[in-house]
Swiss-Prot record:
To B.subtilis OxdC. This is Oxalate decarboxylase OxdD. One of its GO terms (cellular component) is cytoplasm. Signal peptide: none annotated. Its main location: cytoplasm. Mn(2+) 1 binds at residues 104, 106, 110, 149. The keyword Oxidoreductase does not apply. The active site is at 341 (proton donor). Residues 1-25 are annotated as: Disordered. It is found in: Cytoplasm. GO terms for molecular function: metal ion binding; oxalate decarboxylase activity. The keyword Cytoplasm applies. It catalyses: oxalate + H(+) = formate + CO2.
Length: 392
């Protein structure tokens, strides 16, 4: 027997109904999650220009299970949560002051963006050259596939990890504790040249994240390698990079041209003010994986043959756009919308619809679209990634 529930007052103006301004739709009097309907207005009432079916292009970290440890937590969005995301997977992780993501390595490259707080990262490359650095909000790091590394919180911190394989799982990485726990002690004794009883205190299973002590300064912790430091830094200070500034916002692009070690991930940090939008465009070289940092917005994706769908996004959401699919992103809120665009590529690339039309013979564009002079004369030969609505 169903439990009795308080009836929904469907005449309440705060309760959205699936009725579009053109009259299409009807009142929804059945079971529903009103909060989700409010958060996804363009899924609940799609724009009249939406048509056809597109795979889901949105998943929220709020819907991803947490892995809780002493020293921090983590959660992931992979192809298992967002099936279309075959190129990239993402992990949201937090560490306490002194919390350690243990020494480990991956088959995939790791790109990271610091969301808040400070952390220390270490790594050693295949030639015995080492690296140590502190990172803070807006800083990036990149570890190539197979490079062993660690992360430790200097204070409470949170960061986004991005991997160049949608099938990746943070919970199946190669860790030092797990390997040693599954290696016979006589083998460890031979490898390290010490008695077997020296390994009696080793963990019996994977540690993953643990609570440690806050380390001292980089200078006091740095180990001098006989082979020197890594030739290319694993750290990049993105917020210290001058942005491409526009009236409606800004863009900072980072790829192998200005962060040379980042061979498989390119990215852009995009700022869109209220009343502005990321212009109509597409990316010719890779799928796009997005992470929304602040604010709220909506994105419409066009994949051809009359098929376009609109999705709503807010802080903590992940978005996805297939390669070469046309799309735009609007700020639908009252605060600044910040998000990351990430690509499995060594270089960032996008094609602007406006610029393409401006650099094509005018008569050809006019005859193709039956466009008037007002539109044709307004086309821009230079790319403007973020544009403002007229009059705002």
């Amino acid at each position: 027997m169903l439990l009795e529930q308080q009836p929904i007052n469907h005449e309440d103006r705060n309760v959205p109904q699936p009725i579009r301004s053109d009259g299409a739709g009807a009142i929804d009097t059945g079971p529903r999650n009103i909060i989700r309907d409010i958060q996804n207005p363009n899924i609940f009432v799609p724009p009249v220009t939406d048509e056809g079916m597109i795979p889901n292009l949105r998943f929220s970290f709020s819907d991803a299970p947490m892995k809780l440890d002493h020293g921090g937590w983590s959660r992931e969005i992979t192809v298992r949560q967002l099936p279309i995301s075959t190129a990239i997977a993402g992990v949201n992780m937090s560490l306490t002051a002194g919390g350690v993501r243990e020494l480990h390595w991956h088959k995939q490259a790791e790109w990271a963006y610091m969301l808040l707080g400070r952390a220390r990262i270490t790594a050693v490359d295949q030639d015995g050259r080492n690296f140590i650095a502190d990172v803070g909000p807006g800083d990036l790091w990149y570890f190539p596939a197979g490079i062993p590394h660690s992360i430790q919180g200097l204070e409470h911190c949170e960061f986004l990890l991005v991997f160049d394989d949608g099938n990746f799982s943070e919970f199946s990485t190669l860790t030092i504790s797990d390997w040693l726990a599954h290696t016979p002690k006589d083998v460890l004794s031979a490898n390290f040249g010490v008695p077997e009883n020296a390994f009696n205190s080793l963990p019996s299973e994977q540690v993953y994240i643990y609570q440690g002590n806050v380390p001292g300064s980089v200078a006091s912790e740095d180990i001098q390698s006989p082979y020197g430091k890594v030739p290319m830094t694993f750290k990049h200070e993105l917020l210290n990079q001058p942005p491409i500034q526009m009236p409606g916002g800004s863009v900072r692009i980072v790829d192998s041209s200005n962060f040379p070690i980042s061979k498989t991930i390119a990215a852009a940090l995009v700022q869109i003010e209220p009343g502005a939008m990321r212009e109509l465009h597409w990316h010719p070289n890779s799928d796009e994986w997005q992470y929304y940092l602040t604010g709220q917005g909506r994105m419409t994706v066009f994949i051809g043959n009359g098929t376009a769908r609109t999705f709503d996004y807010r802080a903590g959401d992940v978005g996805y756009v297939p390669s070469n699919a046309g799309h735009y992103i609007q700020n639908t809120g009252t605060e600044t919308l910040w998000f990351l665009e990430m690509f499995k590529s060594n270089r960032y690339a996008d094609v602007s619809l406006n610029q393409w039309m401006a650099l094509t013979p005018k008569e050809l564009v006019q005859s193709n679209l039956n466009a008037g002079s007002v539109m044709l004369d307004s086309l821009r030969k230079k790319k403007v990634p973020v544009v403002k609505y007229p009059g705002t």
